[in-house]
Amino acid sequence: MAVIFSSSALGSHTHVDRHLVRQPIRDLENNVDMLDHLSRVLALSSQYHALGAAIALFACACAYALVAPRQPPKFPAPQLYDETGPIDLIALDKTIKEGFQNYKGKYFTLKEAHGETVILPTKFMEELKALPDNMLNLDDEIDERFLSEYSLFTTTSVGGRISTVVNSIKNELTKTLGNLMGDIHEEVVYSFQELIPPCDDWTELDIQSKLVHIVALVSGRIFVGLPMSRNQEYLDCIIEFTLNVFFAVPEIRAYPRLLRWTSRYLNTKVRAVHKSLATMRRLMAPIIDDTKQQLEMGTGPHNMCAWNIKNSNQKERDSLNIQAQMQLATSMAAIHTTSMTVTNAIFDLAARPEYLQPLRDEFQDLRAIEPLPYLDKTSMPKLRKLDSFLKESHRLSPISLLNMRRKIVQPITLHDGTVLQPGMHIAFPLHQISNDEDLWENPSQFDGFRFQKLRDLPGNESKYQFTATGTNNLDFGHGVHACPGRFFAANEIKMILVHLIDNFDFKFKGDIGRPDSLWTPGGYHPDPSVRVLLKRRLKA
């Protein structure tokens, strides 16, 4: 309790004990000293907190600097935006078309989710098409765009090399394709028997879902072989992995960069992807062990599993994780692109039934000349009308809007003096090239036999095929960077379509015309909600 004494009060009470007066004054002085000490402690404490916060902020900045990709210098070209800001590859065709028309023959850039992409004019294609991976790299581009470290999109995510799978496709799959046509045909017939109902009358089907499972069966026959390729758990695993990976990528990207590692534990799609890898490891373990033993004895099956082991380095060969992921990644690529390409072709045929009979006649005429139980590698290229129809369908409904995507690894000087700096992403405008009025007559009009007529011109026999690549044919890339699996995919697609066209009539439910495709990050996808009616043909 504070006591205040006035001088008048002290003067009027001459007998007051002086000790009683001094004690409260000492207490007051002590309290003031304590308050002063406490104030100094609090000030020092706040300084420590500020210092700690500064250190923590500095540590976070250092950590971000370590994980953040190095940004190349800004490319000196117009950058396109939509009404809401930088575009993110959703509903992108209009924006790319604007850039292609306004800057034709020049550079422009797109601000994508993974960074800036420089869109190159086709005049630079020839000088880039043969450059090696240590100058412009596909693996790095894919890993950044699809966040492979977290999504398991590529084999690099588990310590493997994409080149191992590429070598298996180039050196084994493509070269032995002629010996595999019987297996492909057998699996197409089996898959239709298992997955397509009798269709004695018009039957409504979710055709895209059916095709995903048909392609999974046919591809699995070549990738892992019987009996595993028909194992339901294996089929569910590769299909679920394919779907979950593409859904997972944008969800992972929504995480702060420093926290993306947590998506493995917090995100249901990412957890599902890792679960698929664990399932594939379990399913493939005995097959891989058995295949290794056969290869050591100089034998072994003719499938992608064996070829991947054969082309692996020691680290990859010894890793069940890497071998399992190779199986998933290869299956994903096949299921995703092949099923959508076949679906688009079916939609185009259902919308234009006048093409069905000429395609059937071509197949029947060939079968009369070459009475084989199935189309082989030499007879398949003779279906020129079917080849043309597929190419036209792919021209107007591409899987991707951009192609020949790469990341620059070393400085590249183009013939006009422009330097592409390391870290830059590049691409060519596939869809706009395929619809360029300077290249194609009536490009917006569907002409199923457009490319057959072009091939009939002198000197064009080997040009304009479905699998052909070139400056104006970028569906499968070009040069050393062309898709290595396009020959297998083309034969698989044609085998499925021939079986469907030969055995079924089909149409849309109602007079709806050709359904619009859906825009998704990077390209056109056929609308999965569209249903098709099938009816089995009565053949003599």
Curated annotation (Swiss-Prot):
Primary residence: membrane
A GO biological-process term: mycotoxin biosynthetic process
Keyword Signal attached: no
Pathway the protein contributes to: Sesquiterpene biosynthesis
Record flagged with keyword Iron: yes
Cofactor: heme
Induction notes from the record: Expression and the subsequent production of PR-toxin take place under static culture conditions (oxygen limited), whereas no expression of the PR-toxin genes occurs under the strongly aerated conditions required for optimal penicillin production. There is a negative control of the transcription of the PR-toxin genes by the penicillin biosynthesis gene product(s), or by a regulatory peptide encoded by a small ORF inside the penicillin gene cluster.
GO molecular-function terms, A-Z: heme binding; iron ion binding; monooxygenase activity; oxidoreductase activity, acting on paired donors, with incorporation or reduction of molecular oxygen
Subcellular location(s) of the protein: Membrane
Name of the protein described by the UniProt record: Cytochrome P450 monooxygenase prx8
